[in-house]
């Protein structure tokens, strides 16, 4: 059983998944910082510094924290926008790389043969 587990754990896709989870956690910190440290203060300036999280209603002596719910919705949309922008930049960089790779024309069969003939003739003349 130990050998089977070891074989399973050492397979490439399990290790790839573990790396993805760790990178995802690190990326979460980046996105949260972008939202909390950049977007939220800017949004606060736009909406006049309103903090939704303190809004609540008392119903039969129970506090309903609907403001926190609103705050989480705003955070969700800001995180979604941040992720969209990050993915858009990454996609643009990948497209630019693909364009660069596509810009290098691959020689046709004729060009390859002519190059080989040229190289052979050059070697004979030496």
Swiss-Prot record:
<dbReference type="GO" id="GO:0005886">
    <property type="term" value="C:plasma membrane"/>
</dbReference>
<dbReference type="InterPro" id="IPR036019">
    <property type="entry name" value="MscL_channel"/>
</dbReference>
<dbReference type="InterPro" id="IPR001185">
    <property type="entry name" value="MS_channel"/>
</dbReference>
<protein>
    <recommendedName>
        <fullName>Large-conductance mechanosensitive channel</fullName>
    </recommendedName>
</protein>
<dbReference type="GO" id="GO:0008381">
    <property type="term" value="F:mechanosensitive monoatomic ion channel activity"/>
</dbReference>
<keyword id="KW-0407">Ion channel</keyword>
<keyword id="KW-0406">Ion transport</keyword>
<dbReference type="Pfam" id="PF01741">
    <property type="entry name" value="MscL"/>
</dbReference>
<dbReference type="InterPro" id="IPR019823">
    <property type="entry name" value="Mechanosensitive_channel_CS"/>
</dbReference>
<comment type="function">
    <text>Channel that opens in response to stretch forces in the membrane lipid bilayer. May participate in the regulation of osmotic pressure changes within the cell.</text>
</comment>
<keyword id="KW-0812">Transmembrane</keyword>
<keyword id="KW-1003">Cell membrane</keyword>
<keyword id="KW-1133">Transmembrane helix</keyword>
<comment type="similarity">
    <text>Belongs to the MscL family.</text>
</comment>
<feature type="transmembrane region" description="Helical">
    <location>
        <begin position="8"/>
        <end position="28"/>
    </location>
</feature>
<keyword id="KW-0813">Transport</keyword>
<keyword id="KW-0472">Membrane</keyword>
<dbReference type="InterPro" id="IPR037673">
    <property type="entry name" value="MSC/AndL"/>
</dbReference>
<comment type="subunit">
    <text>Homopentamer.</text>
</comment>
<feature type="transmembrane region" description="Helical">
    <location>
        <begin position="70"/>
        <end position="90"/>
    </location>
</feature>
């Amino acid at each position: 059983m130990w050998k089977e587990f070891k074989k399973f754990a050492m397979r490439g896709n399990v290790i790839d998944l573990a790396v993805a989870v760790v990178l995802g956690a690190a990326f979460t910190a980046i996105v949260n910082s972008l939202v909390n440290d950049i977007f939220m203060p800017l949004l606060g300036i736009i909406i006049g510094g309103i903090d939704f999280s303190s809004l609540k209603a008392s119903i039969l002596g129970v506090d309903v924290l609907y403001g926190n719910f609103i705050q989480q919705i705003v955070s969700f949309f800001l995180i979604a926008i941040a992720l969209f922008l990050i993915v858009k930049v990454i996609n643009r960089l990948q497209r630019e790389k693909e364009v660069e790779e596509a810009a290098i024309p691959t020689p046709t069969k004729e060009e390859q043969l002519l190059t080989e003939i040229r190289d052979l003739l050059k070697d004979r003349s030496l």
